[in-house]
């Protein structure tokens, strides 16, 4: 896949959430995709309130050009697993801490403990930015331009850590560890 030859408005990633109350978390995935100029679509698809819509979304995603689906939900969090059971695309589940949650564990375990044959990649509780990055890494397996951008991003992360190490060393020159940096 070469994104330069693709229709820039055709979404490659679907970002779905069980409720609009999940938007504050799921927006993080959208922000990451925007940072890398990857087109996406964003909508609400409830596994419990709109099961037909959910099945329709999953069933048409690949034909619409979607390559990866990021699905976020709180509470029982069935959305990522049900989407994964209904399509062949990679699904990244984002467990969301909700008001009726058991410290988020219900969401985490609902997404993490999928049965054999129905894989869902799972990120941390409220970890939608990592879901966006994982979607980018999946897309980059067939896009050398995106792969190069991600390599630059990783180098920038290394530079930020190196700057923090230098700052600590400046603050505590006699107490700083001697590990290689």
Whereabouts are the PLM-identified features?
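Glycine-rich phosphate/diphosphate-binding loop of Rossmann-like nucleotide-binding domains
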Residues: 8-49
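Glycine/charged-rich beta-loop-alpha catalytic/anionic-binding loops adjacent to active sites
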Residues: 11-12, 38-40, 89, 112-120
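Short glycine/serine/threonine-rich phosphate/pyrophosphate-binding segments
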Residues: 22-26, 50-54, 73-82, 101-105, ...
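N-terminal beta-loop-helix "entrance" segment that forms/cooperates
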Residues: 42-63
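Glycine-rich phosphate-binding loop
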Residues: 57-96
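Short, glycine-/small-residue-rich phosphate/pyrophosphate-handling segment
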Residues: 100-148
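Glycine-rich phosphate/pyrophosphate-binding loop and the adjoining helix
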Residues: 139-181
